[in-house]
Structure formats: structure tokens, C-alpha cells
Swiss-Prot record:
Protein name as catalogued: Tol-Pal system protein TolB
Record-linked InterPro entries: 6-blade_b-propeller_TolB-like, PD40, Tol-Pal_TolB, TolB_N
Chief place of localization: periplasm
Subunit structure comment from the entry: The Tol-Pal system is composed of five core proteins: the inner membrane proteins TolA, TolQ and TolR, the periplasmic protein TolB and the outer membrane protein Pal. They form a network linking the inner and outer membranes and the peptidoglycan layer.
Organism of this sequence: Rickettsia conorii (strain ATCC VR-613 / Malish 7)
Length: 444
């Protein structure tokens, strides 16, 4: 693995079978597994502070997943810490901890820290996983996310998603409104702004490597630019001047091409751009609005929405524009489809009308239309819920949620996450209003 912030020095412990059943994240809601994340042993005060902070992040990651219930340290009976001893399992079972995490932090002469952990099954009294990481002090939070990812993967069978980033549009509450592209950790930490707010910006998108983003900027009312920004160097460049574009491009899995929608002559169509040559290729035909394209994980298909039949619905086509198939058949208008990284589901926004007016919904449906035309499932609804995007393991959806103004409070927009089962909806804290989230892949 190249360009990683830490390297694995050794695999400390063998993986054994364990008593806990693997958590199935796709089929309904199960009670969270109780887990004790013990105090990390430390060899000096700096390591002790780092270990304390890492335990908090690991516990928070596991709690936010909705699949684990971290037990308060005030309940712990055994006082020993570290990885050099075998736990007193009866003491952990007494407080109903099915899983136990022990760890230690040591400061190295280089100034880096060596972090080790073990995951124990207290029922079978077996160690499940263990690893040693070397990490610079300023990247301790990423190391904590990596450990939480390992625990999540061992217990669920799916890769974790904690060591990831979110790019989004931040909007000030003051007038005039200032919109800026912002970047943060998946849990809302380490928020920073990437643009200065001098021009309107929309729909940031990660490149495949997650070290670059693309976004739309309205330089003037008539000039719309797509920018590429390198997150490592901070350098920006103009990808193209695309009059009529409304969303930033989405990228092919190989990173060589991107798709976007552009309005021309009264119609909006899907175009694919070769990022090396900057050549555009039109993929859709006819009249109407075709927009919000998203590649399948293998790059062979594209999902998008179109009002060619009068009401916006979802369609799938081959990446060359052939073999168009409609996949949505429910009542209402569909928008913003996003293909799961696993390839099994497509998330979407759906707008329905009732006696109380419009309702916005986030839903998922099977990606293969021949499977079941009635496979659609709504997982959350509200006054304004939109812009769904997937965690890199395809098990969590992040989206924007809005509330109207009232006599008691102004309107607001925030970012939320929810499991694909429709459970565990939670807000991702941002310093200001937020919209248009995009989730990176797991960082290297």
C-alpha cells in the first residue's frame, strides 16, 4: 500500500474463531454488540494523552455505526491495561462486555508513536485480531479510525469506513450567504475550507484516489467552470468551461473519464469527458432533461434520471449510451441516483405529493431491473432530504437534510447519515449549514 500514513510493522496475533455471530448489516436491526474499549497502556505522559484520545475516537466510531455499544469505563472491574497480559474474562463478562479491546501506546525515538491493540472475544476467551501501527503524532486520529475499521471488519465481515473524508458545500447563516467547499473527517472532525466564498460553488466530487476533488463554480452568471483541486498541494486548475452544466462530473472507476449533464438548445443531456484529451462524447438523445449520471462500480453502466416520459424517472444505460432501461416504476419524481460501491443498490431522492404538500424521500432499489420491479425501499423522509451518497463499503448513506423557516427559528440544512436498513439516522456535525455531501473511499 503506497502513500499510507502508517505502516503495519507486524501482525501480532493469529485470528481464531469466535462465539459471536457475524453481524448482518443488511437484514433489519439487531441489538448493538456490547464492547469495552479499555484504557490504552502508555510509557510516558505524551503517549498517555494520545492513548486517551484514541480510545475516545475508537469508541465513538463503533457507537456511530449503530452496531456496537461501548460500555462506560466507570463500569470496568479489571484494572490491568495493555497487551502483555491475558484479560480476566469473567470480570468483563460480569459487565456484559462481549468484546474487549486492549491497547498500548509507546513513543519512539523518531518522535512517532507505536500503537498496538488486541480485540478479544470474552465468551470464548480468544483473541480475534491484533495489530501494531507506527504513526506520526499529528495523524493519531487516522490511526484510531484504522483500529476501529479493523474491529468493524472482523465483526461484520465488511470493510470499515471510518478512515474516510467528506467533501461538502458549507453555507454561512449570515447575509449575504457565502458558500464554500469544505472538507472534514467522516465524523465531522478536522473541518477546513477549500474555497474562499467569492463565487457560488456546487456539487463537489472526489476523484477516484480521494486526493483530488472537482466542483462547479459560477465565475459569472453566464460562465460556469469545473475546477480540479489537488488536496495535497492545494493547487487548482480549470478542467473546462461548460455553459449549461448544473452538477460537477462523476468519475469512472478507472479515473480516466467522467460523466456530466449539460443543457443545450432547450434539452439537457449526459456527456462523457475523457480527462486526458478533454473530448466530450454525448450519450443521450431526444428531448427533455437527462441529468445526475453515476457510474456502476465496474464502469460498464451509468444510472441517471430523465423526464423523457413526462415525470423524472431513473434509467440505466451502457457506458457508451446503448441499451437504455427504465428501473423506477413508483409514483413520484426521482432524482440524484447514486450507485453503491458494492454494485447491489442504487440510492435516490424521490419527491411525492400528498395533502400536506411535497415530501422528499431517500430510498434504495436493486440495481438490476430484472430482479424485481418493486424492489424500491424508502429509508428516510422529510421536508427536504436529498443528495444521497454511499460509504465506501456500501452500507451507509449520507445525505443533506433541510428544515423550513418558522416564527421561532430560521431554516437550516445539515448532513445526516443512515444505515441502508433505514435505522441509525444521525447528524454529522458541521460548524455551519451544509449540503451536497460526497464520501471518499478509504484513505491510503
Amino acid at each position: 500500500m503506497r502513500n499510507i500514513i502508517y505502516f503495519i510493522l507486524s501482525l501480532l496475533f493469529s485470528v481464531t474463531s469466535y462465539a459471536l455471530e457475524t453481524i448482518n448489516i443488511e437484514h433489519g436491526r439487531a441489538d448493538p454488540t456490547p464492547i469495552a474499549v479499555n484504557k490504552f497502556d502508555a510509557d510516558n505522559s505524551a503517549a498517555d494523552v494520545l492513548g486517551h484520545d484514541m480510545v475516545k475516537v475508537i469508541s465513538n466510531d463503533l457507537k456511530l455505526s449503530g452496531l456496537f455499544r461501548p460500555i462506560s469505563a466507570a463500569s470496568f472491574i479489571e484494572e490491568k491495561t495493555g497487551i502483555e497480559y491475558k484479560p480476566l474474562f469473567a470480570a468483563w463478562r460480569q459487565i456484559n462486555a462481549s468484546l474487549l479491546v486492549n491497547g498500548e501506546v509507546k513513543k519512539l525515538e523518531s518522535g512517532k508513536f507505536k500503537v498496538s491493540f488486541i480485540l478479544w472475544d470474552t465468551l470464548l476467551e480468544k483473541q480475534l485480531a491484533g495489530e501494531m501501527l507506527e504513526v506520526p503524532k499529528n495523524l493519531w486520529r487516522r490511526a484510531a479510525h484504522k483500529i476501529a475499521d479493523k474491529i468493524y471488519e472482523k465483526i461484520t465481515g465488511d470493510a470499515g469506513y471510518f478512515d474516510t473524508k467528506i467533501v461538502y458545500v458549507s453555507e454561512s447563516s449570515s447575509l449575504p450567504k457565502i458558500k464554500r467547499i469544505a472538507l472534514m473527517d467522516y465524523d465531522g472532525a478536522n473541518n477546513k475550507y477549500l474555497t474562499n466564498g467569492k463565487s457560488l460553488v456546487l456539487t463537489p466530487r472526489f476523484a477516484r484516489s480521494a486526493d483530488k476533488i472537482f466542483y462547479v463554480s459560477y465565475a459569472t452568471k453566464r460562465r460556469v467552470l469545473v475546477y480540479e483541486k489537488d488536496l495535497k498541494t492545494g493547487k487548482e486548475s480549470v478542467v473546462g468551461d461548460f455553459p449549461g452544466i448544473s452538477f460537477a462530473p462523476r468519475f469512472s472507476p478507472d479515473g480516466r473519464k467522467a460523466v456530466m449533464s449539460i443543457a443545450k438548445n432547450g434539452s439537457t443531456h449526459i456527456y462523457e469527458i475523457d480527462l486526458a484529451t478533454k473530448q466530450l462524447h454525448k450519450l443521450t438523445d431526444g428531448f427533455g432533461i437527462n441529468t445526475s449520471p453515476s457510474y456502476s462500480p465496474d464502469g460498464k453502466k451509468i444510472v441517471y434520471n430523465s423526464d423523457r416520459n413526462g415525470v423524472p424517472q431513473l434509467y440505466i444505460m451502457n457506458s457508451d449510451g446503448s441499451d437504455v432501461q427504465r428501473i423506477s416504476f413508483g409514483g413520484g419524481s426521482y432524482a440524484a441516483p447514486s450507485w453503491s460501491p458494492r454494485g447491489d443498490y442504487i440510492a435516490f431522492t424521490k419527491i411525492t405529493k400528498g395533502d400536506g404538500g411535497k415530501t422528499f424521500n431517500i430510498g434504495i432499489m436493486k440495481a438490476c431491473p430484472q430482479d424485481d420491479e418493486n424492489s424500491e425501499r424508502i429509508i428516510t423522509s422529510g421536508y427536504l432530504v436529498e443528495s444521497p451518497c454511499w460509504s465506501p463499503n456500501g452500507r451507509v448513506i449520507m445525505f443533506a437534510k433541510g428544515w423550513p423557516s418558522s416564527a421561532k427559528a430560521p431554516g437550516k440544512n445539515k448532513i445526516f447519515a443512515i444505515d441502508l436498513t433505514g435505522h441509525n439516522e444521525r447528524e454529522i456535525m458541521t460548524p455551519a449549514d451544509a449540503s451536497d455531501p460526497e464520501w471518499s473511499g478509504v484513505l491510503n
